[in-house]
């Protein structure tokens, strides 16, 4: 996918990996970058606008845990304004296994609902122009960090959902791939709670391992966007971008 002159919606593109990715996207010259986030960040938005004045950067408040109908209403506002959207990036995520319901609501249900909502506008069966979904999942969707099983399970679910959406492309026309960062130096990793406090030092222990910066992750994210491979499972770890070959253990046969 060519980022230049495209219209992109980025959910949670104002912090951590998201903000650095927004910076890299803006440098590539999209026509519009629409940021949907729960918390406004005027300084970051001003920075993005200044980084490339030719790009129209807009912000809408959005909590991914709202009902599906509210998400559809917001997307209608955006589509009415832009007419077309080329790429949806779902990046909302929390890491706190003390908040079980919210972890699942943000990391999985919110991603599912936002993707489902945009199909109203993209699905070729409804005469839609189709589009691309990039879902930020996690390497914990491959193998869990067992001290944070709720977070890991939510990311595994998001990965499975994304893979299914990709396989439905021949029906809907909508393609999808997953972005799976490894341990990255973000606010999420600085301090978080393990499930039932089984490991109070889990954040500290993770950061003792080799990590990557948010900028390294963002630069590889943009490479994945440009590659635009339907069904790709991208691992963004240690400053590298690698496509994962998923081992098939079972097949429904349908």
UniProtKB/Swiss-Prot annotation:
Residue positions of the active site: 151
Native species: Drosophila hawaiiensis (Fruit fly)
Listed transmembrane segments: none
Quaternary context: Homodimer.
The protein's name in its UniProt record: Alcohol dehydrogenase
Class of the enzyme per the UniProt entry, highest EC level: oxidoreductase
Highest taxon in the source lineage: Eukaryota
Any single GO CC term annotated in Swiss-Prot or TrEMBL for this entry: cytoplasm
Entry keyword annotation includes NAD: yes
Family of this protein: Belongs to the short-chain dehydrogenases/reductases (SDR) family.
Pfam families for this protein: adh_short (PF00106)
Lineage: Eukaryota, Metazoa, Ecdysozoa, Arthropoda, Hexapoda
Residues engaged in binding NAD(+): 10-33
Catalyzed reactions per annotation: a primary alcohol + NAD(+) = an aldehyde + NADH + H(+); a secondary alcohol + NAD(+) = a ketone + NADH + H(+)
